A protein has these predicted regions:
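Catalytic domains of riboflavin
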Residues: 1-272
Length: 272
């Protein structure tokens, strides 16, 4: 049973230290205490997770992460459903909650300058292997680089960032507009949506908790991502170029990202 469905399981996991909370500053807080800075995040883990992605095999510790406000609301509704014998609605209830993930490689207690990837979810690229974007290769490459790095590091997988935050349904519509000649940002605007509506505040809190103020290297071509994290008070970020997965199918898409400010050179866009 999920922790928001069965309170006895929730209590047991809390006693084992496998279910806990952090505040917006990344400080661990007791479940009964009020959070003073930013939204609280509930974490489940660490959960040993052996991964195999193509030829890449590695062992990570997985943490499932969700905003405490979302979890709290679902727990209240779940209590009512349980009292009314409404178990059939639990699946619908669970589907409305965005759960992020943290994948840890190595021992965070020994990190001094870990390698980090904050990765936005992309069903078409990460799962289906679509070449309209470079998301799938970026995720696989990040995990391989982190595994091979002497420091180790982490991937923060942001589940609510599909289509730069507009969601899968709207993303599908932008693909049709792109096929009609618009670039990825023009397509968003045609739908009345922002170029990029992603919120990295939860990623910032998770970085504060796991990295603990140490300098770290961030795998990204997007200076805005660095800027957004720095606005949250995170310092010591070194941006590391992360170009991979360039194909004829996504070259125009990557060119639009270059025009929007991503650090991509002509040589990067010409690569195969």
């Amino acid at each position: 049973m999920f922790t928001y469905i069965d309170p006895s399981i929730r209590k047991r996991l809390e006693e084992q230290g496998k279910l806990f909370q952090i505040d917006g500053d990344g400080a661990r807080v007791a479940a009964a205490h009020a959070v003073t800075r930013g939204p609280a995040i509930s974490l489940l883990g660490p959960i040993p997770l052996p991964l195999k992605l193509g030829e890449l095999e590695l062992q990570v510790d997985w943490y499932a992460c969700v905003r405490r406000t979302e979890l709290g609301k679902l727990e209240e509704i779940a209590d009512e459903l349980r009292a009314q014998q409404g178990q059939a609605l639990f699946a619908t209830l669970a589907s409305s909650m965005a759960v992020n993930s943290v994948l840890i490689v190595g021992d965070p207690e020994r990190w001094q300058d870990p390698l980090v990837r904050v990765h936005s979810s992309c069903l078409t690229g990460d799962v289906f292997g679509s070449q309209r974007c470079e998301c799938g290769p970026q995720l696989a490459s990040a995990l391989q680089k982190i595994r091979e790095d002497e420091q180790g590091g982490m991937v923060i997988y942001m589940s609510g960032h599909e289509g730069r935050g507009i969601g899968l349904w709207a993303k599908a519509a932008t693909y049709l507009l792109q096929d009609g000649g618009e670039d990825t940002y023009q397509a968003n605007r045609s739908l009345g949506l922002p170029d990029d509506s992603r919120d990295f505040s939860d990623a910032g809190s998770l970085l504060k908790f796991f990295v603990r103020g140490q300098p770290f290297r961030l795998l990204t071509n997007n200076p805005k991502k660095v800027h957004d994290l720095e606005k949250m008070g995170i310092t010591g970020i070194t941006r590391v170029k992360h170009v991979t997965g360039v194909t004829d199918a996504n070259r125009r898409y990557l060119s639009a990202k270059q025009g929007w400010g991503h650090k991509l050179s002509r040589e990067d866009l010409d690569a195969q």
